[in-house]
Amino acid sequence: MNWIKKTLRFGEKIKTIIKARATKSEIANSDWTSCCKGPILKKDLEENLWVCPSCNKHHRISPHQRFDIIFGKNNYEVLKTPIPQDDPLNWNDAKPYKDRLRAARKKTGMDCGMMVVNTNIINLKITAIASDFDFIGGSIGAAEGEAFLYGIQHAIENEQPFVVFTSGGGMRMMESLISLSQMTRTTLAINELKKNNLPYIVVLTDPTAGGITASYAMLGDLHLAEPGALIAFAGARVIQGTVREELPVGFQRSEYVEKTGFVDLIVERKDLREKIGSLLSILLKKNSAINSSENETSEDSRTLTKAAS
């Protein structure tokens, strides 16, 4: 057999191996997924709130899954938010932006990458928002900005605390300056919320990065984070290329960020409901250890910290 035939046969073997690989849709529809120690049944992972029982990795989840876990199934009302015109810039790269939006909507069942709900937590009515990383990487465009502003407006009109679960890589490239302007809009909206003396709690989940970190994710009255969540502005390689120094291990993970003061508490997913409820009770001075205007001293601040722990 000459070398040409050997090459052709080798090529056929490669094709066979590639064909044998599972497709993205097959992986998504499989009963199995993988984590630290190999395959794990999705059913087992779901029963553990999508947290790996071996390594405690908090897997990414959709807004519906998150709200079901924290507020309970059928215990929240999804609010209809305004949806501006799709693709105002007629963006087209490897794939037209309108096609990307259609695919994201089909995949997630959402009109945009942010879900706003009216709900309650431990007998406190609140407005909550969560982003879906599966919707174009959780990036923020005009529609997501409108959803955020709608949530703030709803919270102010109903005098409710505002809780945000962040997840995403930043502002959406396909909307250029329209996307970047959402950083300003969300910041101004948060200022209005604070003028009305309404609590604003941010729960940082994996990943929270880019313009999200540089705007509404870091403006909360309190910042909670799930264990192991990536919290960053620029990527580690970009930073290392700029400073040209060895970076600390895990310096963009929630545990390290807590040590540097950007995160107040790291909370397990299973404990988020109780922790958010306790903190809101303290901030609103309802049935909590902090219940009078006298609690403004450093001693009382320690009481607040103890009650929240």
Residue ranges and their predicted role:
Residues 1-110, 121, 279-309:
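Intrinsically disordered, low-complexity segments enriched in small/flexible residues
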Residues 43, 131, 165, 203-204:
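Structural motif
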Residues 169-288:
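Conserved catalytic cores of soluble enzyme domains
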